[in-house]
Design a protein with these regions (language model features):
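Glycine-rich phosphate-binding loops of nucleotide-dependent enzymes
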Residues: 1-209
Length: 209
């Protein structure tokens, strides 16, 4: 609400207000340099707003760290793909899922029964996310070796593995061919139908509409 982000004398955002209503796909459009990615960075705690407030479930998250906001249920993808390139697709999704675990460091070190059960549950949920985004056939493939379009889908799957309440997609169809973009539109609609609110930044108006 009334968010302003200022870097020196430059206003990246000026008095921006909007609300995500439950169950909707909200599109954020604008030319390059308009501040769309800055909005995502404020929502996820990468940037602090100079003025204004950001609320999630009725509480301010303005001073929260990115990992705290992620754990609360706001996940994102990036305009430039940011996968763990040397890890498999399944391992990428499992990393995101760890925000929902309870086992501590000692359990991980000593491989306690509860830790083993939790790790199995993490693997199952991560694989479920890969299946949802149709990249489960790459589960054991190193992320860097996936086709470009599948890397895009994997990044979304990784975000979904955290069971977000709000999903921020920063130009998810960038670099995709028309057929891939069409399939992605269907997937975004399916994501929304699961009850996840989607905020979408995209230059391709076919994806936004």
């Amino acid at each position: 609400k009334n968010v302003t982000v200022q870097f020196g004398g430059l206003f990246a955002l000026s008095d921006l207000s909007f609300e995500i209503i439950g169950g909707e796909i909200l599109g954020l459009i604008g030319p390059n340099g308009a501040g769309k990615t800055t909005v995502f960075n404020v929502l996820t705690g990468v940037y602090n707003a100079t003025q204004g407030d950001v609320q999630f479930e009725g509480k301010s998250i303005l001073k929260k760290r990115p990992y705290e906001i992620f754990a609360k249920g706001i996940a994102r993808t990036f305009q430039n793909i940011r996968l763990f390139s040397n890890m498999t697709a399944l391992e990428n999704a499992m990393v995101a899922r760890h925000c929902r675990t309870n086992t501590g460091v000692m359990g991980a070190i000593f491989k306690t029964p509860s830790q083993k059960r939790e790790e199995a549950a993490i693997r199952a949920k991560a694989l479920e996310a890969l299946v949802f985004m149709n990249v489960d056939n790459y589960a054991d493939t190193v992320a860097a070796n996936l086709p470009y379009g599948s890397q895009r889908r994997l990044e979304i799957a990784r975000a979904l593995a955290s069971e977000p309440k709000v999903l921020l997609l920063d130009e998810p169809a960038a670099g995709m061919n028309p057929a891939e973009s069409t399939e992605l539109m269907k997937d975004i609609a399916r994501i929304s139908k699961t009850g996840i609110d989607v905020l979408l930044v995209e230059h391709d108006m076919k994806v936004v509409t």
